[in-house]
A protein has these predicted regions:
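Conserved phosphotransfer microenvironments
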Residues: 50-65
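Hydrophobic/aromatic residues positioned on beta-strands within the core alpha/beta folds
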Residues: 74-76
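C-terminal output helix
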Residues: 94-107
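Acidic, metal-coordinating helix/loop segments flanking the phosphotransfer/catalytic sites
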Residues: 5, 29-46, 54
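Conserved acidic carboxylate
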Residues: 8
Length: 111
């Protein structure tokens, strides 16, 4: 079972994504900010994250810190810098099925 890290500062959204991904068969870790994410990303196949997360480290800095070492899927409701080293950008609101398919695709790439 692949381990996924979900990074989201909105507690309701975080819990909803955790439940959806667990129901889809993933082992899910969560983080409310970049600092927690930096402590928890190792061992994960994919990081699913909101780009706008609170300081001390914002989403772009988190991406720079982990890019190339784990697959990164960004969920964004706005404009995303085109040069961010992420694997995929999904627009919010993102249907659960699309998120699950995206995660499965990136896990398959790693195998």
């Amino acid at each position: 079972m692949a381990r996924i890290l979900v990074v989201e500062d909105d507690a309701t959204q975080l819990e909803m994504r955790r439940q959806i991904l667990q129901h889809a068969g993933f082992d899910v870790a969560t983080a409310r900010d970049a600092q927690e994410a930096l402590e928890r990303w190792k061992g994960c196949a994919v990081v699913v994250m909101d780009l706008r997360i609170p300081e001390p480290e914002d989403g772009a800095r988190l991406i720079q810190a982990i890019a190339g070492r784990v697959r990164i899927i960004v969920l964004s409701g706005g404009q995303v810098e085109p040069d961010l080293p992420v694997d995929e950008i999904l627009t919010k609101p993102c249907p659960s099925r699309r998120l699950i398919e995206s995660i499965q695709r990136w896990i398959h790439v790693e195998e």
